[in-house]
Curated annotation (Swiss-Prot):
It comes from the Eukaryota. Its main location: plastid. This is Uncharacterized 33.0 kDa protein in psbD intron 8. It is found in: Plastid, Chloroplast. It comes from Euglena gracilis. Keywords: Chloroplast, Plastid. One of its GO terms (cellular component) is chloroplast. The lineage of its organism: Eukaryota, Discoba, Euglenozoa, Euglenida, Spirocuta.
Length: 281
């Protein structure tokens, strides 16, 4: 009887100890996992903040303001775009933005207060912009041509942030939190594309579906349309977006671009830039 009691006691002790060890291991793994997730979220937040910094940097905004102009023109001339096939539609969009990005020809913004649109003309490309509201708040005007024309200058980063917040109905901090809570790191580029071009949602047209950009990483979109001159490496702010998202890219040619640019960054050479690329407009 005594031996049986000892056996039961020993068995109970072993089982209890095993349970305690298992619970301890689970708790430890949970804490480690929590710390890893927390650390990852901090890294993600840094990357997102850097995204915002890149997108709102003066030299980067040239591309985005032209995209916004073309997109707004699509809404005015929606029938023309809808009559095209998805491939032709996307091709036309890329051509329009590329034409606006050409620094060799001054871009003039023709404003007619009697009409509900603005006309941008550059290198033979005329774009009707449906609303003057955001244009006045987004662009700095240098009215030197006539009373009805203006040469638009650099986009103010603070105004770009205001524009993003206005159309996304949330402030930058909320956008960052939203990304961390609802989007994986690989989806941040798509999230930002949707937010930057939020005006499409108001017309029941999703930008990523409309031109097929959902299959193209935002950086590729940027590099392609800006002829790879839009983002420049700086010693004080390395291009984390390339290292953080490297595994996400499936495009072989773009991966080669990434590796090439990473090598340049390590060598402190940065990106090659055209001296007049950001100042030609």
């Amino acid at each position: 009887m005594f031996l049986k009691d000892i056996h039961q006691f020993f068995l109970g002790f072993v089982i209890t100890n095993t349970i305690i060890v298992i619970i301890g291991q689970i708790n430890l793994q949970f804490k480690n996992s929590y710390n890893i997730v927390s650390g990852l979220k901090v890294q993600q937040l840094d990357s997102i903040k850097y995204y915002c910094k890149v997108l709102t940097h003066d030299s980067s905004c040239l591309f985005f303001r032209n995209c916004l102009a073309v997109i707004d023109s699509i809404i005015v001339n929606i029938d023309e775009y809808l009559s095209l096939s998805p491939f032709k539609r996307r091709e036309k969009f890329l051509q329009d933005v590329e034409s606006l990005n050409n620094p060799s020809v001054p871009a003039r913004l023709f404003i007619n207060p009697k009409k509900d649109f603005i006309l941008i003309h550059r290198k033979g490309v005329s774009l009707k912009i449906r609303s003057t509201f955001q244009m006045y708040s987004i662009y700095k005007f240098n009215v030197s041509v006539s009373k009805n024309a203006a040469i638009f200058n650099t986009l103010r980063p603070s105004d770009f942030i205001s524009f993003l917040e206005y159309y996304s109905d949330m402030n930058i901090n909320e956008i960052l939190i939203n990304v961390l809570n609802n989007y994986g790191l690989n989806d941040i580029s798509l999230f930002l594309v949707k937010k930057i071009f939020y005006l499409f949602d108001s017309d029941k047209i999703f930008f990523n579906e409309f031109i097929g950009v959902d299959s193209v990483p935002l950086e590729y979109f940027l590099l392609f349309l800006s002829k790879k001159y839009i983002i420049r490496a700086r010693k004080e702010s390395p291009l984390k977006i390339y290292t953080d998202f490297e595994d996400f890219y499936i495009h072989g040619s773009f991966k080669n671009i990434l590796k090439m640019q990473q090598q340049k960054i390590k060598q402190n050479l940065g990106f090659k830039t055209k001296s007049n690329f950001f100042t030609g407009i």
